[in-house]
Amino acid sequence: MGLSDGEWQLVLNAWGKVETDVAGHGQEVLIRLFTGHPETLEKFDKFKHLKTEAEMKASEDLKKHGNTVLTALGGILKKKGHHEAEVKHLAESHANKHKIPVKYLEFISDAIIHVLHDKHPSDFGADAQAAMSKALELFRNEMAAQYKVLGFHG
């Protein structure tokens, strides 16, 4: 289920918009994740106390973590499918330390698509959305495969 060169170009063009403000985009993605799926907040001891969207927007720690998440994802996307080492490392930490279920990766993928569309509607049309969805699905499938190797059934 690889992406074509054209699809990767759409993904990287969209990601270029993210890179104009990685922390801001990351914060919005996490806010959308936590407000849309409050159960995900339970995996983050550092953020459990944030109960409202206003509290989340005011949290510098949430913004920093959003930057970390999207910086890691951007590094993976830029590898255009050749990211085995990065995914293996990420899967190990997310399975063994953080215990993040694959379902939560689906939730954050949806949040990424929505934030990109909300912030950049003219640059993130149907073709770009489809390509990004495909790239994120590829990433999730590889994370799930690594989880299986690690014996994590999240």
From Swiss-Prot:
**Complex formation:** Monomeric.
Q: Which GO terms describe its molecular function?
A: heme binding; metal ion binding; nitrite reductase activity; oxygen binding; oxygen carrier activity; peroxidase activity
The EC code for this enzyme is 1.7.-.-, 1.11.1.-
Q: Which GO terms describe its cellular component?
A: extracellular exosome; sarcoplasm
This chain's source organism reads Bubalus bubalis
Query: Any idea what this protein is called?
Result: Myoglobin
Q: Which GO terms describe its biological process?
A: oxygen transport; removal of superoxide radicals
Keyword entries, A-Z: Cytoplasm, Heme, Iron, Metal-binding, Muscle protein, Oxidoreductase, Oxygen transport, Phosphoprotein, Transport
Q: Which domain of life is it from?
A: Eukaryota
Please report any disulfide bonds recorded for this protein chain, giving both cysteine positions. Answer: none
Which family is annotated? Belongs to the globin family.
The main place the protein resides is cytoplasm
Q: Where is this gene product found?
A: Cytoplasm, Sarcoplasm
Function recorded in the entry: Monomeric heme protein which primary function is to store oxygen and facilitate its diffusion within muscle tissues. Reversibly binds oxygen through a pentacoordinated heme iron and enables its timely and efficient release as needed during periods of heightened demand. Depending on the oxidative conditions of tissues and cells, and in addition to its ability to bind oxygen, it also has a nitrite reductase activity whereby it regulates the production of bioactive nitric oxide.
Which residue positions does Phosphothreonine occur at?
68
Q: Globin domain: from which residue to which, for each copy?
A: 2-148
